[in-house]
């Protein structure tokens, strides 16, 4: 439809596949692949050394018509290629050479092992992490810091809402129980007032966690008394099948995502939102925890009193959570992002078809919100430099958007479309 907001412009089956497959973000090794210290595999070709690559699936694209009456067709513009590496390991968790120092920082140093590397006839030694180093990073960072920390934020407590990169005073999980927190992250009473009074400082005393664990075990071991054909009464397990349904919902929307994302250190923002589904699944067990407590009380108090007491007592858990989190989850009167974007747009001249160049999400989205939602300064053309290297975004820049005329780009589409002019010789004689 060529709307002003048209990310990746999925207009045919191939571009739609790339869009849904998030191919613009690249790939990461999951089961077998390189380490951050691995060297590319080399091979000799015609007496020279070249990188050894694997040619993958073809990339199709709608062929650009030279004339309007030319028939629609698709062409292969390139093949996906994967570089081969000389050093590989199973289940690679430390694979990004851009984060080498961060990997070592998280592990407090890496033992590593020296392995030989044939550099086209010249044998050199390369230090790569061991499998144990790799597994330690998986547990310390990817599981503990990038999943269980977020999980405990929701069901035990949160230190503050300042983004953490492993610091002891930023963004950790706590309980609100002093001696436990002292063991986890040190004496919290020694923190400066701005951290102690941070609105994101929420303590639940692990009550939601405990209630959820009660529900988990109650569901898994729930039985039902039945009478066999020969008149014998037995306890038949009825909860375990239901337990596995909730468990796999919990696993597939939480830990399985951790395995798939294979995240690197120094993430640009907290990623708790990626695992919200598993937190919802655990909330099912919290609800079942109330039923488990009620059933336990029934043997002592009777059915109705047990249900009332269990409900009233357990109601204090969500009340405690609301009392702690309302102030930092209340989104009313929060206009920083809106005002940020509006201030940017307000400073742009009103005459001469203005263009504002941005770089990255945080610069761009507040501007888009103001234009798309509030209709503010739709005469300004927002041009994201991060996208400008793609053909679909150049197409958008060449079209009118609201009150902003097309950007005066004079190239024909054949000159910048994918598969054409991807390497431009500035010195042909070289």
Describe each model-derived feature in a short phrase.
Residues 1-275, 281-353, 358, 364-430:
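ER/secretory pathway lumenal C-terminal domains and tails of membrane proteins involved
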């Amino acid at each position: 439809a060529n709307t002003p907001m048209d990310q990746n412009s999925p207009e045919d089956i191939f571009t739609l596949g790339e869009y849904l497959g998030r191919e613009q973000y690249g790939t990461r090794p999951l089961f077998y692949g390189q380490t951050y210290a691995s060297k590319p595999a080399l091979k000799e070709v015609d007496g020279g050394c070249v990188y050894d690559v694997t040619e993958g699936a073809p990339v199709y694209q709608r062929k650009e018509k030279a004339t309007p009456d030319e028939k629609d067709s698709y062409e292969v513009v390139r093949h996906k290629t994967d570089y081969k590496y000389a050093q590989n390991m199973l289940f690679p968790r430390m694979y990004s050479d851009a984060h080498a120092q961060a990997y070592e920082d998280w592990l407090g140093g890496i033992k590593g092992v020296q392995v030989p590397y044939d550099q086209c006839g010249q044998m050199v030694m390369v230090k790569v992490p061991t499998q144990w180093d790799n597994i330690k990073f998986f547990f310390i960072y990817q599981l503990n810091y990038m999943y269980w920390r977020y999980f405990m934020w929701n069901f035990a407590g949160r230190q503050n809402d300042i983004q953490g990169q492993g610091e002891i005073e930023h963004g950790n999980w706590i309980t609100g129980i002093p001696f436990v927190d002292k063991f986890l992250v040190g004496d919290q009473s020694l923190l400066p007032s701005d951290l102690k009074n941070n609105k994101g400082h929420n303590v639940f005393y692990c009550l939601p966690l405990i209630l959820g664990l009660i529900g988990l075990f109650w569901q898994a071991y729930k039985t039902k008394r039945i009478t066999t054909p020969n008149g014998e009464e037995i306890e038949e397990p009825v909860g375990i099948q239901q337990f596995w349904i909730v468990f796999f919902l919990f696993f597939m929307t939480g830990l399985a995502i951790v395995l798939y994302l294979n995240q690197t250190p120094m993430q640009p923002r907290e990623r708790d939102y990626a695992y919200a589904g598993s937190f919802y699944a655990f909330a099912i067990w919290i609800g079942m925890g109330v039923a488990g407590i009620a059933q336990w009380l029934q043997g002592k108090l009777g059915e109705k009193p047990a249900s009332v007491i269990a409900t009233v007592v357990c109601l204090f858990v969500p009340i405690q959570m609301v009392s702690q989190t309302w102030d930092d989850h209340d989104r009313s009167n929060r206009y920083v992002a809106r005002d940020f974007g509006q201030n940017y747009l307000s400073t742009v001249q009103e005459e001469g078809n203005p263009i504002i160049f941005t770089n990255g999400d945080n610069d761009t989205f507040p501007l888009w919100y103001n234009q798309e939602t509030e209709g503010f300064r739709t005469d300004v053309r927002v041009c994201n430099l991060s996208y400008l290297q793609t053909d679909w975004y150049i197409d958008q820049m060449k079209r009118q958007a609201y009150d902003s005329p097309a950007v005066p780009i004079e190239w024909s589409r054949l000159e910048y479309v994918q598969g054409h002019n991807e390497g431009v010789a500035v010195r042909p004689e070289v």
